[in-house]
Each structure stands twice: as C-alpha cells, then as structure tokens.
C-alpha cells in the first residue's frame, strides 16, 4: 500500500489541522450541551440534520470542537465516540489521494451537508480497528 506521507502528493500538505472534530452521539442533546457548557465549552453552531432527523451541536473550547448529535441510539458506554474528523483544504484532492492509496475501504464518495455558513463536504473511511476517520472541508 503506498504511503501518503513523504510522497509527491502528501496528505499533510492537504490538511489544515490535525483534528477538526470529535463526534459523540447522544440520546439527549440538551443534557450533553449542558454538561460540556459546565466544562467551559460554548455552542459554536447548532442545526438539524434533516436527512437523518437529528439535532446537531458543535461545542468549542479553545481549538477543540466536539460535534454531538441526537440519534437516540447512543451506546452509553466507553468507546462511544463515533468518529474523528480531519480538516482538509481540498476535499476532492484528498479523496483522490486516499482512494488511490487503497485506503477508501468504505468506497465512500464526497457528500454535502448544509452545516455552518456555506456547508461542508466530507467523506469517511474506516481504520484498521473499525474506527471512522472523516475528511471534511468547510465551504
């Protein structure tokens, strides 16, 4: 499997930061927001993912952003974080690199959600431990 670090098309050159968000499913978004607000987080953005009928909130403390979404199916046990997201500059280029390196094991395509001011484009792959790694670009 080709490496994406040290190659001509380096993924490091395509990212904006190490991690963009950590995503936590919840059964009660208001309780989750209240908990993180007590820890000093502020609501950075709040919306509804109408396609999935889920309330969504992005909570920010410094450079850490937690995305929480109410899906009524949260595991409520350790290991319940759904995915990590990596912020990229050019989603199409990164998708091409990941797919070309044989890392797009889910065969996921680039999707769009109307989050934030202009939306976000993203795709998700699966790591060797079944963890989800999302690559996303704010528009």
Can you say where each PLM-predicted feature lies in the sequence?
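Single conserved hydrophobic/aromatic residue that forms the stacking wall/gate
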Residues: 1-13
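Short N-terminal helix-initiation segments at or just after the protein's N-terminus
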Residues: 7, 22-34, 66-74, 99-103
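First exposed extracellular module after export/assembly in secreted or surface-exposed proteins
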Residues: 12-15, 111
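Core segments of cupin and vicinal oxygen chelate
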Residues: 16, 23-65, 116
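Short, solvent-exposed beta-strand edge segments and adjacent coil->beta transition regions
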Residues: 17-21, 79-83, 120
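Vicinal oxygen chelate
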Residues: 26-30, 84-132
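Conserved short beta-strand elements that form part of the metal-binding/catalytic scaffold
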Residues: 44-78, 125-126, 131-137
